[in-house]
Regions:
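A short, surface-exposed loop/turn module that caps and links secondary-structure elements
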Residues: 28-52
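Enriched for short, Lys/Arg-rich terminal
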Residues: 1-12, 16-23, 34, 53, ...
Length: 82
């Protein structure tokens, strides 16, 4: 099972979200711990992955050797890629 780690920036972004969105994202993160490749999409032109949860996106890096999912950014789909 993968371990999920937030960067400091991602943690601040996550905590700024409304409580119901935090709970929804937390629920999905619990499910992806087992097989993240079934839930994420590779980013085009960059290394890393995106996870879609409603109108929100998480930018992730996955280390398959260490079994770590690193959450790099959390935000609304309008702003996350800027």
């Amino acid at each position: 099972m993968y371990e999920i780690i937030f960067t400091d920036k991602a943690k601040k972004q996550f905590l700024k979200l409304e409580k119901n969105n935090q709970e929804r994202i937390g629920s999905v993160l619990e499910r992806i711990k087992i097989r993240p490749e079934h839930f994420v999409e590779r980013l085009v032109g960059e290394f890393g992955y995106k996870l879609r949860i409603g109108d929100y996106r998480l930018i992730l890096d996955i280390d398959k050797n260490k079994l770590i999912i690193l959450v790099l950014k959390v935000g609304h789909r309008k702003n996350i890629y800027k």
